[in-house]
Amino acid sequence: MLKLLSEIGPVIAFFAGFFYGGGIQNATLYMLITAIICVTICYFVDKKVSKLSIISVSVLLVSGIITLISGNSIYIKIKPTILYVIFGIIFLMSGIRKNPFIKYALESIVRLKEESWITLSYRAAAFFFFMAVVNEIVWRNFSDETWVKFKVFGVIPITFIFILLQLPLLLKNKLPDSKI
């Protein structure tokens, strides 16, 4: 539950900052502060921070600080695209190399046959590349307000649907000692 909150907390802070705090600059500041707090709490509770979280927060810090200094919102808008492409490449390459990164991220929750991890890696890569394209379309063609709403009311449900669509693969190929 803590991991989920640390992932969506900064997005919620961004949304609230945009609509109640006066625009993208304040939203970016709120998201940066929330992300740093969430990662710090996760570190003290779990004694570790995942590699994906480190990558996410690092890209957020760079794009967020540049956005705040320059006053140009393009940097915070391309942050999701950059992250999605990085994650897509990580999952694609780990699938190609037959050493699925997703296995290390999810193995504590579910144990699968090895070929299923590879399939899941390719699916995750396709999902992240798709999300990169969608983010580019939305921020380049719609208002800041629409883009911010999409981050909350679009990205979260799309991600949830993607996860649900993976359940048949997970349930069919889970090992007997799996937690799900």
From Swiss-Prot:
HAMAP family: YciB
Major location category of this protein: membrane
UniProt cross-references to PANTHER family, sorted A to Z: INNER MEMBRANE-SPANNING PROTEIN YCIB, INTRACELLULAR SEPTATION PROTEIN A-RELATED
Protein name from the UniProt record: Inner membrane-spanning protein YciB
GN (gene name): yciB
GO cellular component: a single term: plasma membrane
InterPro entries (alphabetical): YciB
Highest taxon of the lineage: Bacteria
Originating organism: Rickettsia canadensis (strain McKiel)
Entry similarity comment: Belongs to the YciB family.
Keywords, comma-separated and alphabetical: Cell inner membrane, Cell membrane, Membrane, Transmembrane, Transmembrane helix
Membrane-crossing residue ranges in chain numbering: 25-45, 54-74, 76-96, 118-138, 150-170
One Pfam family named in its UniProt record: IspA
Membrane topology: Multi-pass membrane protein
Subcellular location: Cell inner membrane
Function: Plays a role in cell envelope biogenesis, maintenance of cell envelope integrity and membrane homeostasis.
